[in-house]
A protein has these predicted regions:
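Bacterial N-terminal signal peptides that target proteins for export
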Residues: 1-9
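Bacterial N-terminal signal peptides
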Residues: 8-19
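Zinc-dependent metalloendopeptidases
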Residues: 19-252
Length: 252
């Protein structure tokens, strides 16, 4: 039994060392998303959608968000759903508590997007963010190498929201060859999902309640701001790498 315990301790130590050397020296294994899988791209870049449960104003914002992604120059086509089994479904639920979507194409089932009432009044920011998930993109601040770029203050995260900050291994990303992007539409703001979010000052990584603090940079006022509802240049590059390039969309 003693020999077994020794061997187990050695293996555990090696596993921790491997995690530190390959996934970021400061990444705490307790903050790693487990049982994750690499998202799948939508076949042919065709995404059927259903927005019939939304109000007229919400439908307009959802369509604008789709147009933002198509303007990236990626080979993407959003089409109204007819009888497809796999499609993006805007649920129309504004009381779900959080904005949610599954990541990527789901074989044999739909992707549900929930957006709270507050965010339907903030232009197309959140619809574009949740569509990013539906296209297969994780949160930027959950990258395997994020510790080189941001500090995550887990002590300030709202109960039940840690999963939105846990880091995801590189093997579980649909594309992992782009640089870290503070301006990504998939990056949270400084205070989001914070336990004292109402007291936190977005754009100030030194705020006592801040969850995200850029490492050695002045990007506090950049991360998660999504200026003019833009999808960043790096977001666009990711979309083109996954779905191919639509030269006609780029030239417009």
């Amino acid at each position: 039994m003693t020999g077994f315990i020794v061997r187990w301790a050695i293996l555990l130590g090696l596993a921790r060392l491997l995690a530190q050397t390959t996934l970021g020296a400061d990444s705490d294994p307790a903050h790693m998303q487990v049982n994750g899988t690499k998202p799948m791209a939508w076949p042919g870049g065709v995404i059927p959608y259903d927005i019939t449960k939304l109000s007229a104003d919400e439908q307009t914002l959802a369509l604008r968000a789709m147009a933002r992604w198509m303007a990236t120059g990626a080979q993407l086509q959003f089409i109204p759903r007819s009888n497809q089994v796999e499609y993006v479904n805007f649920t129309g639920r504004t009381d779900a508590g959080n904005n949610t979507s599954q990541d990527g194409f789901q074989k044999g089932k739909r992707v549900d997007i929930n957006i709270t009432a507050f965010w339907w009044h903030q232009a197309e920011w959140m619809p574009a963010h949740e569509l990013g998930h539906a296209l297969g993109f994780h949160h930027e601040h959950q990258r395997w190498d994020r510790d080189e770029f941001v500090t995550i203050h887990y002590e300030n995260i709202k109960p039940g929201r840690q999963h939105d900050y846990d880091w995801i291994p590189q093997t579980n990303w649909i594309v992992s060859s782009t640089a870290y992007d503070y301006r990504s539409i998939m990056h949270y703001r400084v205070c989001w999902a914070g336990a004292c979010e109402s007291e936190c000052k977005d754009g100030d990584g030194n705020s006592p309640c801040a969850v995200i603090d850029p490492v050695g940079t002045n990007f506090d006022r950049v991360i998660g701001q999504w200026d003019d509802n833009h999808i960043s240049a790096t977001d666009a590059e990711k979309a083109r790498r996954v779905y191919g390039t639509n030269a006609a969309a780029i030239s417009r």
